[in-house]
Amino acid sequence: ETAHLIIDVQKTYLESKENQKENEEWQPFFNRMKDIVIPNIKSLISFTREKKIENIFARIACHKESGLDRSLSQKKPGFNYLLLPKDTPSGQIVDELKPDPDDIVVMKTTDSALTGTNLRLILRNMGIKNVVCTGIFTDQCVSSTVRSLVDESFNVIVIEDCCAAATDELHKHELEIINMIYCHVVNLEEAK
């Protein structure tokens, strides 16, 4: 009845930025990912596999090399602009969390892992009622996915120390917004 959904933990988000100033601005995010989020998600994946709980991965990827099939938010200039053709190395899940051959991986071109994918149908077909969400970015794809799941009558848990946003402030603020309205926010220790 429960599945673990890992959202957008892709190589592109851990790559160095083009200039030093941008790298410095993103360093707290990189540190949180390396020191907390990725190790915690890895631990949770091991735990869920032991308990025979499904791990499902969502990743941003477009089918066409040109990106023609991307959503408007990914085509517009700015922070969300993203061109990640499905076979691009930087668009793959990070090596530390590499899906097993039998794990489901959905590709999306929207913030929500439900919009524009068959994830909703997959969850229903598998008899899933509860979804544990982890990944990035808390204030974008994680939040959008949580809201979509709740709208589709799934029970949702977000694991705080298995998620990250561009800044800790954004991360904490978004968790305050979605907690108890759309989901229950817990830490990894509480979830196990």
Description of each model-found segment:
Residues 11, 33, 59-62:
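Short glycine-rich, polar/acidic loop-and-turn segments at beta strand-coil junctions
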Residues 17-48, 53-54:
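A short alpha/beta connector and helix-capping loop motif
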Residues 3, 7-9:
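N-terminal nucleotide-binding beta1-loop-alpha1 segment
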Residues 56-58, 132:
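A structural signal for short, well-ordered beta-strand segments and their strand-loop junctions
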Residues 1-3, 17, 46-51, 63-66, ...:
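Active-site-adjacent betaalpha module
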Residues 10-16:
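Short acidic, Gly/Ser-rich segments with clustered Asp/Glu that frequently serve as metal-coordination loops
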